[in-house]
């Protein structure tokens, strides 16, 4: 049938019948973000010393230099302890995440994270330092003055835990160190791993993974002794605020499709706190960062009347303070959103970041040259990490020293390294102070830090659940913990020979199913993107995010949901899952999009299943169970975990006990 011209023409590499490429390695690292850059750096360090024969391979669906959440750069490192102690770090994270966190994992990270930051600086990352007179030196000035964190010089802090950097090339610097450690022959880029594979002979044992090349028609099958999966969080699982021509602009990276959670869950890894989400309040439409404005420039967020709504709505915190929450200097992020949403519902929006007052107050004590420098820093805050926000300010003639700029809660994101804590249940360190319930013992009786409940499978960064506030530095440090443990595992399991249930041909057919769907059905319509025989990846995602937005507590319902709404969403998702078998790809880019959608569907459905199970509103401002408003510590001061049985194809959701390790008061 002749085709009519289509606005949605294929953009990727032409797709055709693939060849099969097989690999056999000892340590396989899936993902190229901060976590696996740390894992690679540390694994090579220990393997060179104790297992030089070990075959190590890092596989990334993108290019390592600009892969992951830090791809665009950052203007601050949000986790650097310095003079603070790990106990207080745990208290801060626990307070922000409403009292339910894995304190063993957070403490363990806190005692290691600074070393990663020192490495970043040594590798060339410009860090702001205080001079002898207490004045701020930017990265270039600090380097010229011979200042460094490793030497004991004080960083410029934008908050108790945050330090300022000139970080547009942050990820490039960290990736270069990982590349230097691995060598080019142990890195494969542009390969999208989409499915993990269990061992045929040993129950609950990882054996490998399968994916495909984004630049050539190849299906890649990997056998591995140990594996770490760190492919970020989940974005575009809810309808974004940026739609139409703005579609694709998001706060977290749009290439994070829930792959970490889906792939690990599908092989039986126990998941935890998947009901948790992060809804950041950011500059409207551009999603620009607000941290430097709040913390460094001391700006306030106000309603349309110029009122500090966190002050006028202070009474909203009382019910939480009475239960022991929202105490001290840290108001949980979700509760700050809770107060902002009230302003918006009651007609006191828009909400503004009062940039004008903040800058004018600072200008009062500055020379003209200092004023221009501060103004430049305000713009560089965006240029370092969110160029689109700088573009938006320029396009709307916004001068921050003359008028404020709107801020607004975004659509929900699923992640485990920012102010969110959904993810995979991972083992804590094998130390006496760690509760036994927090340790995952392998068949040999040993505990391997950060290993999932699937033997030989690790995760880190966004993957590890119940332990947020890692950010970039913590993700790298956690990856280093994993890299060392993987080498230890290899030394203990050298004789393991992985074997799959699936044949290579079966895997090829599964991976390229969207291509075969397109070839089979393309003659049924004159328009290649509207066809009775298949569904395009873009149209599938539009259906998915409409469903989650309306029934799963998205922006369209002001983050409200209920059992009835969730059940309706699950009913629609049953049909979506049926339709997912008909996803079609006209090129390799669309094949990528198809597999991202498989992962999105699985991840966001699990998120909604956890919300349905937890009958309370643990994170007001992130989501509300309208039929169970408020906290219920008597029933729900616990983790909600889930486990999928690959043999029975069933997911069970259950409670897991929470243990407080660090005392409440210092």
UniProtKB/Swiss-Prot annotation:
Keyword Oxidoreductase belongs to the record: yes
Gene Ontology terms describing biological process: dissimilatory sulfate reduction; protein heterotetramerization
- EC number assigned by the record: 1.8.99.2
Recite the UniProt keywords alphabetically.
Cytoplasm, FAD, Flavoprotein, Nucleotide-binding, Oxidoreductase
Q: What class of enzyme is it?
A: oxidoreductase
pH effects: Optimum pH is 7.4 for the adenylylsulfate reductase.
One example GO MF annotation: adenylyl-sulfate reductase activity
Q: Where does FAD bind?
A: 32-35, 60-61, 67-69, 78, 193, 259, 417, 461-462, 472
Q: What does this protein do?
A: Catalytic subunit of the adenylylsulfate reductase which catalyzes reversibly the reduction of adenosine 5'-phosphosulfate (APS) to sulfite and AMP during dissimilatory sulfate reduction.
Under the subunit heading, UniProt states: Heterodimer composed of AprA and AprB. The heterodimers can dimerize to form heterotetramers.
Q: What is this protein called?
A: Adenylylsulfate reductase subunit alpha
Q: What organism is the protein native to? A: Megalodesulfovibrio gigas (strain ATCC 19364 / DSM 1382 / NCIMB 9332 / VKM B-1759) (Desulfovibrio gigas)
Which gene produces this protein?
aprA
């Amino acid at each position: 049938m002749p085709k009519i011209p289509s606005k949605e023409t294929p953009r990727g590499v032409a797709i055709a019948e693939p060849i099969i490429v097989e690999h056999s390695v000892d340590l396989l690292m899936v993902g190229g973000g901060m976590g696996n850059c740390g894992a690679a750096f540390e694994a090579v360090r220990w393997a060179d010393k104790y297992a030089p024969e070990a075959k190590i391979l890092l596989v990334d669906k993108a290019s390592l230099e600009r892969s992951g959440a830090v791809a665009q750069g950052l203007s601050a490192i949000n986790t650097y302890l310095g003079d603070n102690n790990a106990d207080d770090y745990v208290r801060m994270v626990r307070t922000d995440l409403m009292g339910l966190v894995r304190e063993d994992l957070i403490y363990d990270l806190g005692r290691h994270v600074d070393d990663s930051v020192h490495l970043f600086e040594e590798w060339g990352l410009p860090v702001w330092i205080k001079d002898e007179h207490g004045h701020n030196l930017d990265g270039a000035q600090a380097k010229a003055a011979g200042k460094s964190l490793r030497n004991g010089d004080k960083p410029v802090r934008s908050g108790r835990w945050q330090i300022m950097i000139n970080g547009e090339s942050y990820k490039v610097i960290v990736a270069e160190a990982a590349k230097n450690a691995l060598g080019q022959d142990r890195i494969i880029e542009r390969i999208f791993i989409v499915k993990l594979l269990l061992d045929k002979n040993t129950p609950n044992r990882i054996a490998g993974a399968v994916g495909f090349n984004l630049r050539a028609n190849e299906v890649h099958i990997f056998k591995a002794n140990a594996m770490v999966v760190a492919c970020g969080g989940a974005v575009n699982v809810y309808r974004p605020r940026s739609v139409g021509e703005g579609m694709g602009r998001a706060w977290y990276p749009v290439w994070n499709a829930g792959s970490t959670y889906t792939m690990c869950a599908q092989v039986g890894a126990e998941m935890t706190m998947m009901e948790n989400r992060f809804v950041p309040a950011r500059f409207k439409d551009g999603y620009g960062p607000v941290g430097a404005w709040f913390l460094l420039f001391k700006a306030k967020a106000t309603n349309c009347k110029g009122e500090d709504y966190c002050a006028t709505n202070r009474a909203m915190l009382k019910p939480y303070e009475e239960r022991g929450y929202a105490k001290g200097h840290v108001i949980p992020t979700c509760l700050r959103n809770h107060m902002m949403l009230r302003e918006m519902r009651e007609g006191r929006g828009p909400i503004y970041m009062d940039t004008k007052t903040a800058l004018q107050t600072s200008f009062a004590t500055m020379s003209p040259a200092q004023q221009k420098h501060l103004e430049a820093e305000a713009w560089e805050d965006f240029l370092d990490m969110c160029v689109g926000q700088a573009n938006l300010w320029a396009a709307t003639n916004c001068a921050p020293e003359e008028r404020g700029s709107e801020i607004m809660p975004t659509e929900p994101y699923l992640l485990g390294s920012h102010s969110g804590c959904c993810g995979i249940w991972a083992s804590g360190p094998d130390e006496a102070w760690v509760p036994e319930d927090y340790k995952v013992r392998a068949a040999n009786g040993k505990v391997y830090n950060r290993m999932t409940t699937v033997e030989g499978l690790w995760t880190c960064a966004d993957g590890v659940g119940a332990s947020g506030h890692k950010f970039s530095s913590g993700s790298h440090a956690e990856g280093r913990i994993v890299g060392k443990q993987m080498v230890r595992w290899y030394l203990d399991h050298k004789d393991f020979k992985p074997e799959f249930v699936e044949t290579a041909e079966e895997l090829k057919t599964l991976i390229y199913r969207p291509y075969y769907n397109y070839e089979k059905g393309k003659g049924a319509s004159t328009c290649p993107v509207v066809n009775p025989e298949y569904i395009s990846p873009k149209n599938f995602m539009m259906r998915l995010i409409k469903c989650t937005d309306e029934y799963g507590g998205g922006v369209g319902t002001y983050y409200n949901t209920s059992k009835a709404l969730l059940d309706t969403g699950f009913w629609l998702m049953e049909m979506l899952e049926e339709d997912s078998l008909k996803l079609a790809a006209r090129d390799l880019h669309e094949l990528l999009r198809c597999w991202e959608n498989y992962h999105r569907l699985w991840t966001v459905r699990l998120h909604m299943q956890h919300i349905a199970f937890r009958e309370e509103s643990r994170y007001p401002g992130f989501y509300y169970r309208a039929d169970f408003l408020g906290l219920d510590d008597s029933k729900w001061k616990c983790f909600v975990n889930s486990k999928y049985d690959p043999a029975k194809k069933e997911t069970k959701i259950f409670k897991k006990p929470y243990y407080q390790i660090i005392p409440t008061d210092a």
